[in-house]
Amino acid sequence: MAKPRPDLPPPAALRALADAEGRLTLRVTPGARTESIEIAEGRVLVKVRAKPHDGAANAAVLALLAEALGEATSRLHLLRGAIGRDKLVQLPPA
């Protein structure tokens, strides 16, 4: 069975929530049934299927966010939240 495409918001909507330095705050749910990025009440909620083991969930979050932004995963950097659900990610300049 093919993996369903994740539900992703437009890149402009995600970039609009970043601060002046291009940092985006995320709330992550690892081990979810489906992968998605939602914007709710001015917050970015990310759900990934990967379990939080050996950084697998963090890698999945960056890959999903990169897909939503149309950027390479290597251009995104996790600044804070390596072991928590609240994360701060540095986005590349638009």
Question: Could you tell me what each predicted segment is?
Answer:
Residues 1-73, 77-94:
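Contiguous, often N-terminal, cationic amphipathic patches that form binding interfaces
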